[in-house]
């Protein structure tokens, strides 16, 4: 450490950092609105990069009546009981999200990775919004790459989308698809294949046991795939290391989350849950 004069105050970022509220070019916004206006079945996909801008993204989804799918790492950023939530997409995901991916005619992605694990279909027309320019079209070409801060961009699009008159068909279909999936999950509760408690039972019980403000640390492996597929988020804060190769993450992460929050008056007593397989634990 460097010595400081008695009574010296800490420095600030003033004069060193500019605003992060980067707005896309007006011409790009015009292109995006033209595609949104012509789409009959748009969907929104959010990744972990959109975690601080979900209020703006959900407001945009509501103005478009567009289903919101999440990547696995973004699970919980929109509660599964929201009328426009479609759950997780990809190998760890729900058949609800998969169905809407197949049926959509336009993808609007915010802060999402396009790795193979996410399940985003590259042949679909894609508008990709990201604050990180290096993330745009990183894996393949997209129809409209949009460089901008996610909250600022989503808010701007939501304001302009007020002139669009979306139908309610997709919202109705969401309710129908969730009903089908929940019925299927219920049927799996009693089907253990002779191997004891199954994943559907574990995560149905967990969903009933923990409050909506809990923190959930998730490990890797089959237990994690099952968590993404079966657990219905109520808005819990979900922590995960990524995808594979980091077995053993959940339990120490849960301890760290507990230690980091319990001294804060607003978080005192907040439940913390660790989800691990036998190898991870």
Please tell me what each predicted stretch does.
Residues 1-36:
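Conformationally flexible catalytic loops at phosphate/diphosphate-handling active centers
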Residues 45-46, 99-110, 263-281:
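A short, small-residue-rich loop immediately preceding and capping a beta-strand
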Residues 178-269:
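Active-site diphosphate/adenylate-binding microenvironment
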Residues 40-53:
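Glycine-rich phosphate/diphosphate-binding loops and the adjacent beta-loop-alpha structural elements
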Residues 45-46, 69-71, 109-110, 148, ...:
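General beta-strand structural signal in soluble alpha/beta enzymes
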Residues 28-42, 60, 101-103, 205-214, ...:
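Glycine-rich phosphate/diphosphate-binding loops that line cofactor/substrate pockets in enzymes
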Residues 6-17, 79-81, 179-190, 235-236:
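Gly-rich Lys/Arg/Thr-decorated short loops/hinges at beta-loop-alpha junctions or inter-strand turns
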Residues 74-177:
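Glycine-rich, acidic loop regions that bind phosphate or pyrophosphate groups
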């Amino acid at each position: 450490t460097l010595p400081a004069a008695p009574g010296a105050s800490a420095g600030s970022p003033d004069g060193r950092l500019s605003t992060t509220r980067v707005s896309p070019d007006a011409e790009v916004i015009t292109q995006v609105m033209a595609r949104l206006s012509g789409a009959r079945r748009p969907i929104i996909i959010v990744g972990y990069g959109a975690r601080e801008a979900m209020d703006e993204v959900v407001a945009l989804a509501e103005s478009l009546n567009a289903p919101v799918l999440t990547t696995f790492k973004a699970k919980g950023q929109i509660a599964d009981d929201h009328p426009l939530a479609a759950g997780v997409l990809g190998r760890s995901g729900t058949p609800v999200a998969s169905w809407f991916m197949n049926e959509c005619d336009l993808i609007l992605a915010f802060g999402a990775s396009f790795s193979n694990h996410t399940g985003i279909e590259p042949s679909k027309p894609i508008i990709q919004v990201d604050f990180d320019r290096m993330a745009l079209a990183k894996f393949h070409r997209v129809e409209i790459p949009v460089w901008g801060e996610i909250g600022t961009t989503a808010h701007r699009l939501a304001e302009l989308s007020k002139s669009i008159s979306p139908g309610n068909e997709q919202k109705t279909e969401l309710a129908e698809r969730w009903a089908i999936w929940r019925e299927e999950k219920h049927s799996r509760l009693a089907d253990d294949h002779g191997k004891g408690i199954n994943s559907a039972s574990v995560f149905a019980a967990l969903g009933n046991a923990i409050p909506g403000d809990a923190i959930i640390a998730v490990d890797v492996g089959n237990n994690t795939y099952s968590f993404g597929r079966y657990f219905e988020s109520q808005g819990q804060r979900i922590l995960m290391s990524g995808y594979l190769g980091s077995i053993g993450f959940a339990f120490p992460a849960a301890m760290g989350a507990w230690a980091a929050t319990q001294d804060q008056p607003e978080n005192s007593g907040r439940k913390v849950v660790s989800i691990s397989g036998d190898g991870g634990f």
